[in-house]
Every structure is written in structure tokens, then in C-alpha cells.
């Protein structure tokens, strides 16, 4: 699912803003995930999943930093996230649908934070970008 030049520009422009708030947006995205889809908490039995917890903050930062790697390597997302793909498929065994759920929560968090910048075109570009990441993270399942 190749991104056009315009879509890449839309992703990187918003990412420049998101990158300054990785911890808070990552935390908010995970909190949205757990509030909207409580079944996803089963993958984090060792975490304190209460609102604002240090563990959620840390994992949210990891998730957004991985997205940052994908942005930096937007023409080779597969290569940038190869190790994460193996980790989630072979060790963590995360149900692939959860990547789509988290992507939706990230979209909501970013849109809520930057409403004037999150135009329909930007939304579509980010949706396609996050779908590409989800595809990479689930390709080892096959």
C-alpha cells in the first residue's frame, strides 16, 4: 500500500507536531484503547493499566517512537519495523485486529490534538500510513 508524495508530506507534517508530544499522545492513545476496547488489556497483565500510569506512559512512548521510525523510513516501513513484526507475531502473539484498534485510537488522539491540521486529506493519509504499519506488523502471522 504505497503512499503518494502528497500523503507522505501529510504524514511527516503532522508527525513533526506529534513528535514533540510523544509521551502524552502515546499515553492518551493507550488509554483510549483500553477504555474503548477493554479486551485489549489482556495483553498487558503485568501492567498497571490505570489512567496515567508510568507503565502506560512508557509503552505509549514506545509505540509512538516506533511510528516515528516508520515516518523516518517511510519508503521502507517493512525494514524499519522488521524486528517489531517478529516480536509481535512470534513472542507476544498479539491478535492482528488489535493493531487496527490501536491505529484508530492513535488517529483519534492526533485529530483531537490538532483539529485544524487534521483535514480529511491528512486523515486519509494517516489512516493509510497506520494501515501500512499494521500490515507490516501482521505479515509474519501468515
Swiss-Prot record:
CDD domains from the UniProt entry: Hb-alpha-like
PROSITE patterns: GLOBIN
Gene Ontology CC annotations of this record: haptoglobin-hemoglobin complex; hemoglobin complex
A molecular function (GO) term: heme binding
GO term, biological process aspect, one: cellular oxidant detoxification
Start and end residues of each Globin domain: 2-142
Keywords: Heme, Iron, Metal-binding, Oxygen transport, Transport
InterPro entries for this protein: Globin, Globin-like_sf, Globin/Proto, Hemoglobin_a-typ, Hemoglobin_oxygen_transport, Hemoglobin_pi
Binding site for heme b: 59, 88
Task of the protein: The pi' chain is the counterpart of the alpha chain in the major early embryonic hemoglobin P.
Family: Belongs to the globin family.
Miscellaneous comment text of the record: Only one chromosomal locus was found, suggesting that the pi gene either does not exist or is an allele of the pi' gene.
Protein name: Hemoglobin subunit pi
Organism this protein belongs to: Gallus gallus (Chicken)
Amino acid at each position: 500500500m504505497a503512499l503518494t508524495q502528497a500523503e507522505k508530506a501529510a504524514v511527516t507534517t503532522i508527525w513533526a507536531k506529534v513528535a514533540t508530544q510523544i509521551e502524552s499522545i502515546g499515553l492518551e492513545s493507550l488509554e483510549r484503547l483500553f477504555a474503548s476496547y477493554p479486551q485489549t488489556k489482556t495483553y498487558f497483565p503485568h501492567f498497571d493499566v490505570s489512567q496515567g500510569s508510568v507503565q502506560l506512559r512508557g509503552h505509549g512512548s514506545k509505540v509512538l517512537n516506533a511510528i516515528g521510525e516508520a515516518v523516518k523510513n517511510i519508503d521502507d516501513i517493512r525494514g524499519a519495523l522488521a524486528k517489531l513484526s517478529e516480536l509481535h507475531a512470534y513472542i507476544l502473539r498479539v491478535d492482528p485486529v488489535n493493531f487496527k484498534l490501536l491505529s484508530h485510537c492513535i488517529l483519534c488522539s492526533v485529530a483531537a490534538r490538532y483539529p485544524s491540521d487534521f483535514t480529511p486529506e491528512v486523515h486519509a493519509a494517516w489512516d493509510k500510513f497506520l494501515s501500512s504499519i499494521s500490515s507490516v506488523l501482521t505479515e509474519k502471522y501468515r
